[in-house]
Amino acid sequence: MTFVDRFLQDWRVRKARPFIHAGDRVLDLGSADGVLFERLGNCGPGSLGIDPILPATTRSRQGFALVRGYFPQDVPASAGPFDVIAMLAVLEHFPAAQYGPLAEGCARLLKPGGRMIITVPSPAVDMILDVLVKLRLVHGMSLEEHHGYEISQTPDIFAAPKFELIEHASFQLGLNNLFVFRRTKAS
């Protein structure tokens, strides 16, 4: 990762941090190398990161485990329930056909009252990232996986009765969005 990649990643983590409390059991989808856990430093036991591009030699660290694989099918059966599910710059990598299984997996693994924290860039970011990649200022991790995601889809994917939107805000000059959902008690 370049300095700019890390800067943008840290910005997303800072936006998520207020919604993650000390001791929360966290599931980080698209965890990369576990940076969210390292930045938080206070996640509860049983916290888990999952990412299909983790190197096969990736090792779990004290306080959290890392699993190479796809969500939800590769989450260990013993995992969860979680207080928080984080998807920081991840949702746009899911094809539309996977939104249903994604939402169902999140509903199954998130405790009632638990929080799901999502950051998703606006479609304009893809053009900006293309330029930054050409200038070698960012690596543009998995840009080929962006599927033309529209931000307005987000509340519909994680809809009632299983989820309740409790916060939506834009940041990074409107180029990124934060969504926070609460898992309802409805099944």
Model-derived segments and their meaning:
Residues 1-80, 84-86, 100-103, 142-148, ...:
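Conserved N-terminal segment of class I S-adenosyl-L-methionine
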Residues 157-163:
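A structural motif corresponding to the C-terminal end of an alpha-helix
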Residues 21, 94-95, 110-112:
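Helix-to-beta-strand junctions that scaffold the AdoMet/dcAdoMet cofactor pocket
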Residues 100-112:
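A short glycine-rich, Lys/Arg-flanked "PGG" loop and its adjoining helix->strand segment in the class I
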Residues 36, 75, 95, 126-127:
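Glycine/Thr-rich phosphate-binding loops of Rossmann-like dinucleotide-binding domains
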Residues 113-120:
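Conserved beta-strand signature within the Rossmann-like core of class I S-adenosyl-L-methionine
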Residues 123-144:
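Short, glycine-/aromatic-enriched active-site segment of Class I SAM-dependent methyltransferases
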